[in-house]
Amino acid sequence: MNSVNSIRSTFLDYFQLNGHKIVSSSPLVPRNDPTLMFTNAGMVQFKNVFTGLEQRPYKQATTAQKCVRAGGKHNDLDNVGYTARHHTFFEMLGNFSFGDYFKEEAIFLSWNLLTKEFCLPEDKLLVTVYHNDDVSTELWRKISGLPDEKIVRIATADNFWAMGDTGPCGPCSEIFYDHGDEIWGGPPGSAYEDGDRFIEIWNLVFMQYEQVNKEKRVELPHPSIDTGMGLERIAAVLQGGHDNYDIDLFRALIAVSQEITGVKATGDFIASHRVIADHLRSSAFLIADGVLPSNEGRGYVLRRIMRRAMRHAHLLGAKEPLMWRLLPVLIHEMGQAYPELVRAESLISETLKLEEIRFRKTLERGLGLLSEASTDLKEGDHLNGEIAFKLYDTYGFPLDLTQDALRCRGISVDVAAFNKAMEGQKAKARANWSGSGETVTEAIWFSVRDQLGATEFLGYETEKSEGILTALVRDGEIVDDISSGQKAILVVNQTPFYGESGGQIGDSGTISGKNFVFEVHDTQKKADGVFIHIGEVKSGQARMSECVELTVDGVRRKKIRVNHSATHLLHEALRQVLGSHVTQKGSLVSPDRLRFDFSHPKSVSLEELEKIEDLANEIVLQNSEVTTRLMLVDDAISEGAMALFGEKYGDEVRVVSMGNRLEKGKLKSRWSIELCGGTHVERTGDIGLIHIVSESSVAAGVRRIEALTGTAARLYLSRQDARVHEIADLLKTSATDVEERVRILLEDRRKLEKELNDERKKSVLSGGIVKSDQEDITIINGISFMGRVVKNISPRDLKTLVDSGKKKIGSGVVAFIGVSEDGKGSAVLGVTDDLTHKLNAVDLVRILSGILGGQGGGGRPDMAQSGGPKGNKADEALAVLKASLEG
């Protein structure tokens, strides 16, 4: 039997033998066509080659391109499961010529493959040509020998292809297979062409013109070829059937869904099994290409596909998540051709299971509401749109899921009322937001989101993409264009630029159009998902709705990724060394450094910092894989994932895991697990090195570490090493002996300082170190007074001097003011015990403090101290004190 895999291989090998380059399928998320939600044809990845914007090292190519048609103008979702040939995911086989061969060789290659390689009977084939394409008509006669009645001229747009209103275009020639008169339907161009008897299996597009404008079309100097053959369709033909769902690939998937559910694919259950098999393919491939279920853009299309399949699983009586259990069969069937399925198996499986668990919680309640609301409805009636909106808003039912659930009863939904309810919710949200105190400028982003939706973020998968300008803002107002030298903000429908959040700063780079270059200085996220690109027009003029190319500064992004992953490792290391009380209180992730704030009641010792750094670097040296997955927030927390300070999370969260905990040489668990929407390295080894450069206090109970990574850390340590060698030279010792040499010097200094201090105290008491003549003992109102100003005596030693002075005079008041090298004054004043009943040392020392610029003083009645910044007024302070005693 011709299996799907063998047919694909035969096609590619055939064209390779005929001089074509086998080119891998491009991702389902187009990088070079922002007008498309998903890749839906083989030529999408070659669009810029056909238009001359891109050159490739080959002139002929062949591909097996994965495609999705669900959402946007190409939407087959509603029909999947109910027809023989509609799919959300399909493979497009194609061969392409970029200005090389043209019609004759294209027709020959296609006819030869079908009749010689695939061995299709010639009498089962017929072709169509554009009504005035005489060249193709004659070539078909010559090459195939088909009679004129099997070369059908078609005058409609079905046989003329155009890339858009302008650009490459040309006539088509379609090849049909006749399944026989036992199946209803007529040939193309007839009144019964919509039947299933004649099925198009291959479309050959002859790009020979350029549409200059609506009225003008000119010949291309180098005409090209673009062909497309649906793999599922040709497989059905080659396997002797006319229904795509009867091919080996779908039979394998449906066999497993029958086995798991215990329900045969017969009668009313055929559609459910087919929906599950088809939707598993599109879901798995979209997840593998970086799309995750969400409530916006591509992610919402994926969610709609998944939930539609989940409702059909419910119809089959499945009590547990079903789709993920079919995944091994899909990977067995398609994993060799598409290794991305194998690489992403864990992510796909977990995402499918998670989404089904999450939706199952509301599915039955929502279906109960739908059943109750539609009980009295009959065929041809409409379900109230407000009920459909409640199912959407409260129970997570996409509109098309509700429509699909009612389809078998012939009941539709009042879509206009549904849309009205949706608009009412948006208006309520706007009213609530307008009272939140945000600035007028911020209000713009809410308006943009309301009209255009959230920005599609592509930055996890790529640093370069195309997009369409959806808003230009200058001086707080939306404008139609911006010109060179003007600072402005750009909004694009999709972007690889990361918007600042979770401590990670926004990306920078360039956005360029046909006639302008815009330098992005920063990227921010506003209004729950609108990415704004802040910067300046460097040249030219940008206009609304223009197609642009967005390029992130990759070097800067790489440094940010490294630092962000390093914060995760440091966070876990802090918890292991200091304790589980450590929680993140804030962070900054920039290209130059990282900063991490955390809860801890005291400073972190040098020994602890070394342990933290060593632990983090051990994980760096593991070079273990950094993985991301989507989980329910409660499940993530229960698995030990740590949340970021100040972040708000929805029901589903992105979980980043890195590092391995090993037990007896086997993986026990991941080392660090955090909820995080930021960008990260692929492996911990990409970080290179982590070095903590400082630790400090931010607030009571909050500490901060700052660190460098990679090259920055290496250069920092290299400079530190150079400084150590310089110091060693100054000390006339080796670098390894610097620590001991410094310790000896400090000990010598301590001894010398003690000796010097002792001599100073002796000198002061003997009157040797004085600043003025006021050091003599004087009698004031019968009270002995000793006042002295001394230099470089510590407050503690001043107390010793005052005690000695009190003993020396026997009865009286002693005041010493020490002036430090930085000019500050410290005052200590003592009153002998026999005088404390009438003189208080605290009151007297405050007189000194006032002159020294201090804030009072304190102590006991017999001994008090104070100080101030104005040590140069020490003499004046003593004079004022004496005057007070004379009072």
Swiss-Prot record:
Localisation: Cytoplasm
Alphabetical list of SUPFAM superfamilies matching this protein: Class II aaRS and biotin synthetases, Putative anticodon-binding domain of alanyl-tRNA synthetase (AlaRS), ThrRS/AlaRS common domain, Translation proteins
SMART domains in UniProt: tRNA_SAD (SM00863)
InterPro entries, per the entry: aa-tRNA-synth_II/BPL/LPL, Ala-tRNA-lgiase_IIc, Ala-tRNA-ligase_IIc_anticod-bd, Ala-tRNA-synth_IIc_core, Ala-tRNA-synth_IIc_N, Ala-tRNA_ligase, Ala_tRNA_ligase_euk/bac, DHHA1_dom
One protein family per Pfam: tRNA_SAD
Region (Disordered): 854-873
Catalytic activity reported: tRNA(Ala) + L-alanine + ATP = L-alanyl-tRNA(Ala) + AMP + diphosphate
Predominant cellular place of this UniProt entry's protein: cytoplasm
Cofactor detail note: Binds 1 zinc ion per subunit.
Superkingdom, taxonomy of origin: Bacteria
Enzyme Commission designation: 6.1.1.7
Cofactors (names): Zn(2+)
HAMAP family with a match to the protein in the record: Ala_tRNA_synth_B
Function: Catalyzes the attachment of alanine to tRNA(Ala) in a two-step reaction: alanine is first activated by ATP to form Ala-AMP and then transferred to the acceptor end of tRNA(Ala). Also edits incorrectly charged Ser-tRNA(Ala) and Gly-tRNA(Ala) via its editing domain.
Domain notes per entry: Consists of three domains; the N-terminal catalytic domain, the editing domain and the C-terminal C-Ala domain. The editing domain removes incorrectly charged amino acids, while the C-Ala domain, along with tRNA(Ala), serves as a bridge to cooperatively bring together the editing and aminoacylation centers thus stimulating deacylation of misacylated tRNAs.
Full protein name: Alanine--tRNA ligase
Organism: Bartonella henselae (strain ATCC 49882 / DSM 28221 / CCUG 30454 / Houston 1)
Classification of source organism: Bacteria, Pseudomonadati, Pseudomonadota, Alphaproteobacteria, Hyphomicrobiales
